Amino acid sequence: MTTVIQRRSTSNVWEQFCEWVTSTDNRLYIGWFGVLMIPTLLTATTCFIIAFIGAPPVDIDGIREPVSGSLLYGNNIITGAVVPSSAAIGLHFYPIWEAASLDEWLYNGGPYQLIVLHFLIGVFCYMGREWELSYRLGMRPWIAVAYSAPVAAATAVFLIYPIGQGSFSDGMPLGISGTFNFMLVFQAEHNILMHPFHQLGVAGVFGGALFSAMHGSLVTSSLIRETSEEESQNLGYKFGQEEETYNIVAAHGYFGRLIFQYASFNNSRSLHFFLAAWPVIGIWFTALGISIMAFNLNGFNFNQSIVDSNGRVVGTWADVLNRANLGMEVMHERNAHNFPLDLAAVEVAPAIRG
């Protein structure tokens, strides 16, 4: 009798790991993008929570005037934020080991870079994971394409804008009031409200909300009755049923008569593509606009564009907006510079002519 002893193949462990990572039978799909997504998002989330609760003040402007952002240093949920890295750091990569001490790293806002860079890698991988799962299931890739809009927006405010401005201190703070401060300063310095790409983004977001509400209300109003008056209409739908749950002809007829015939879709597929494409394209344009304004190609300037026959300026809303911009810029970093850049660049006329 001969006994054959075969060495266990070490490749089996790797093959089992590959099958587990790419299996669509798992409760949560991991995927190869998920292998990188999970640790990066966990790192960003953990550091954000710790920094939001207890990070010391950060010298954001690089002028030895630290700004407090954490809860333990006097802030609340509304005013709290992870303060961006110091202007003294600029665009330098600033991991913990580049600082002389942990205190220096915290003082210069190192956690902001750690959170933002890990977060961006994580959301990029999440988008890739959406594509990967769609591929495994034989689906089309439009879920990942739609998700690319908020990914592009996050990349614009957290990475592209700081690169264009020359410092991570110009990035968006990670907090509620910090976000509003970022928006006001962005308007003051770049006149974003007068940029056509931002206007397309507003149309995309508000239009998408309107179309979503219209579609949902039309479907809900034209459900095919499958229940009695005493039962909930939701019980009339069975998951996976083949027949339609609402009457698209009735919805089409109603909407066509409410506005006009060709305002209503008669194809469910083209309708849902439109509902997805409208806000996505709008947010794409907004992200592109922020990326353009990052390099100071700003919104339109119509200040003092209308004058009467005597040469006197006839004020418009553009002039009102310009005055508001100057006021916001005066208040921004008021200890870092004395005047808004727009005023400082203007040649001062002498008070007395000789």
Curated annotation (Swiss-Prot):
Keywords: Calcium, Chlorophyll, Chromophore, Electron transport, Herbicide resistance, Iron, Magnesium, Manganese, Membrane, Metal-binding, Oxidoreductase, Photosynthesis, Photosystem II, Thylakoid, Transmembrane, Transmembrane helix, Transport. Chlorophyll a ChlzD1 binds at H118. GO terms for biological process: photosynthetic electron transport in photosystem II; response to herbicide. The D1/D2 heterodimer binds P680, chlorophylls that are the primary electron donor of PSII, and subsequent electron acceptors. It shares a non-heme iron and each subunit binds pheophytin, quinone, additional chlorophylls, carotenoids and lipids. D1 provides most of the ligands for the Mn4-Ca-O5 cluster of the oxygen-evolving complex (OEC). There is also a Cl(-1) ion associated with D1 and D2, which is required for oxygen evolution. The PSII complex binds additional chlorophylls, carotenoids and specific lipids. Its EC number is 1.10.3.9. The record marks A344, A345 as: Cleavage. The chain crosses the membrane at residues 29-46, 118-133, 142-156, 197-218, 274-288. It comes from the Bacteria. The gene is psbA1. Pfam families: Photo_RC. InterPro entries: D1/D2, Photo_II_D1/D2_sf, Photo_RC_L/M, Photo_RC_L/M_CS, PSII_D1. This is Photosystem II protein D1 1.
